[in-house]
């Protein structure tokens, strides 16, 4: 087995005159052979000289192979590896954008919390108002007559969509019902509780019919 061999790194004190790289996996060479092509290849407006890395040399060779009339250049490579001085100038801008995004996210979260609180407050007010209305209806129904026209009364209906000009409020043994003009019945479960009178009447009927059966049999015998 062959062991892993770390590639040798070559360094330049001043760095590459094009990209400003101070270390490379290939050797640095003198830039005199390529200085005449720097202006068109890299879009430079000033003359540069010194050491050049192998990566920039390959870019010059690629530029020479371009077809005639081509305006392509590698200007984005110029000073691309200038070192930490260039990075420090870019970091504050990134931090500003991050802080701005954090401020926006905080504002959105605050708005969401306020919206949830508003909904919870509205729900609590409606829930607290509904139980307070039910005793009012029961007291009014007990004090009032058994049947009354809802159109003439000042009470508000149990249902907001209930038409008081059509439905008539009635008090029965099991509670309060609303009866229409054609006999239809509307029941509110909060005001209507089935009583046991119907069950008692149903159980009494078979007992009353039981003693009558022998009388019929005696008449047949006579």
UniProtKB/Swiss-Prot annotation:
It is found in: Nucleus. Pfam families: FAM60A (PF15396). Residues 111-154, 199-222 are annotated as: Disordered. One of its GO terms (biological process) is negative regulation of cell differentiation. Keywords: Nucleus. The keyword Coiled coil does not apply. The keyword Protein biosynthesis does not apply. Residues 124-135 have a biased composition (Low complexity). Disulfide bonds: none annotated. Residues 136-154, 210-222 have a biased composition (Polar residues). It comes from the Eukaryota. GO terms for cellular component: Sin3-type complex. Residues 111-121 have a biased composition (Basic and acidic residues). Component of the Sin3/HDAC corepressor complex at least composed of BRMS1, BRMS1L, ING2, SAP30, SAP30L, HDAC1. Found in a complex composed of at least SINHCAF, SIN3A, HDAC1, SAP30, RBBP4, OGT and TET1. Belongs to the SINHCAF family. Subunit of the Sin3 deacetylase complex (Sin3/HDAC), this subunit is important for the repression of genes encoding components of the TGF-beta signaling pathway. Core component of a SIN3A complex (composed of at least SINHCAF, SIN3A, HDAC1, SAP30, RBBP4, OGT and TET1) present in embryonic stem (ES) cells and is essential to maintain the complex on chromatin. This is SIN3-HDAC complex-associated factor. The lineage of its organism: Eukaryota, Metazoa, Chordata, Craniata, Vertebrata.
């Amino acid at each position: 087995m062959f062991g892993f061999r770390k590639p040798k790194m070559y360094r330049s004190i001043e760095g590459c005159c094009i990209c400003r790289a101070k270390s490379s996996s290939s050797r640095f060479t003198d830039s005199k052979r390529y200085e005449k092509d720097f202006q068109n290849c890299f879009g430079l407006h000033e003359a540069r000289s010194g050491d050049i890395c192998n990566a920039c040399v390959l870019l010059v060779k690629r530029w020479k192979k371009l077809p005639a009339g081509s305006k392509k250049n590698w200007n984005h490579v110029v000073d691309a590896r200038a070192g930490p001085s260039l990075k420090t100038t870019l970091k504050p801008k990134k931090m500003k954008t991050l802080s701005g995004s954090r401020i926006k996210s905080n504002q959105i979260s605050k708005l969401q919390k306020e919206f949830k609180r508003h909904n919870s407050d509205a729900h609590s007010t409606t829930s607290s108002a509904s139980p307070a209305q039910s005793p009012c209806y029961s007291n009014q129904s007990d004090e009032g007559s058994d049947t009354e026209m809802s159109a003439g009364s000042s009470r508000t209906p149990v249902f907001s969509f209930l038409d008081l000009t059509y439905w008539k409020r009635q008090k029965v043994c099991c509670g309060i019902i609303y009866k229409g003009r054609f006999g239809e019945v509307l029941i509110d479960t909060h005001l209507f509780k089935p009583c046991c009178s119907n069950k008692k009447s149903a159980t009494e009927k078979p007992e009353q019919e039981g003693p009558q059966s022998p009388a019929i049999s005696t008449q047949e015998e006579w």
